[in-house]
Amino acid sequence: MDMGGNGMAMPPPPAPVKKARYMHMTFFWGKNTEVLFTLWPGARGGMYALAILFMFALAVLLEFRGYRVLEARLARRRAPRAAAALRTAVHAVRVGVAYLIMLALMSFNGGVFLAIVAGHAAGFLAFRAGLCGGGPAPPLEEDRKNDPVCC
């Protein structure tokens, strides 16, 4: 069927050129990486150091959230509904931080990995092993029930 175009069809528009992005699937050691957000920290050394400190702080925060003295204090509040709402909000923050840490680990950057492990170790030492506060945090009753090692 002839549309009167003399057989001359317009060429298709050129495809947009996209910069190829590479995601590491093995650990690598370098500051040129992306952690959590596109182009962050990028190729800037100062931003990479900030990313390392941020991941360290997130890991310490996650260990603080596991601090059972805080949980026990929240459980002893007089208003059970308000305490339940507060405990739920704190739990939501804990889960969100844990997912952010997991996503950062998926960058496979060795420095990020070491910062997260060091943050967990520092947080454990400070809050769970008893360096801060009045000794090791006592376990809650539900922890004892769910512990597979406990008799």
Swiss-Prot record:
- At the top level of its lineage, which domain of life is listed? Eukaryota
Presence of keyword Ubl conjugation: no
**Cellular component GO terms, alphabetically?**
plasma membrane
Main localisation, per the record?
membrane
Q: Alphabetically, which GO biological process terms does the record hold?
A: copper ion transport; defense response
Keyword annotations: Cell membrane, Copper, Copper transport, Ion transport, Membrane, Plant defense, Transmembrane, Transmembrane helix, Transport
**Which residues are listed as membrane-spanning?**
42-62, 97-117
Effect of disrupting the coding gene: Reduced copper transport ability, increase in copper content of the xylem, and enhanced resistance against X.oryzae pv. oryzae (Xoo) PXO99.
Localization recorded for this chain is:
Cell membrane
| Membrane-topology annotation of the record | Multi-pass membrane protein
Task: Give the similarity note.
Answer: Belongs to the copper transporter (Ctr) (TC 1.A.56) family. SLC31A subfamily.
Q: How does it assemble?
A: Self-interacts. Interacts with SWEET11 and COPT1.
- Protein name per the record: Copper transporter 2
Organism of this sequence: Oryza sativa subsp. japonica
